[in-house]
Amino acid sequence: MRSSPPEKRRAAVPKAGERTSPSAAAKPPRVAFPKKNQPPSAASFAARLPLALGKRFEMARSFLLRQPDVKEDVYYYGPKTGWALRYVHGEQPLCALLLHGDLPVGIVSLSASAAAALDWKALSPIGQAARKHAHGSPSLLWLDVPLASTGAADFKAIVRVKLATLDRT
């Protein structure tokens, strides 16, 4: 019977506290713009993405800028999130567009009235997954909607409902 050298046998057995699989050693996504003293331009967000994702990001951005009384600014959310494009309607925050790793994400907070007014069943599976993974409280629900694939259309639908409820108040 042949056995492997002792060095190889020891390498196959993990030590206490050592991670055993590549998925267990997965690193968190890289922050696109982490430094507070280096604010990016609005165009540099889409420039960091592959062409197809950059177009979706720009489409969401242009949709938001076409809405009446909506303004865009670049806002620093902290070292874990970095810089993002923040959109405000009048004085109230509307949403934010940011890069999470190498993916564009739209973040929207919905009040209870906006969440009740939204037709959740009309959203794609990406929008429904965003609802399933939403965080916050029933009075203020936070949705992280990936802008890849059909998520961009879901993001626009959610923002339209939020704008409609903001206009009523």
PLM regions: where:
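Charge-rich, low-complexity N-terminal segments
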Residues: R2-L65, K71, Y76-K80
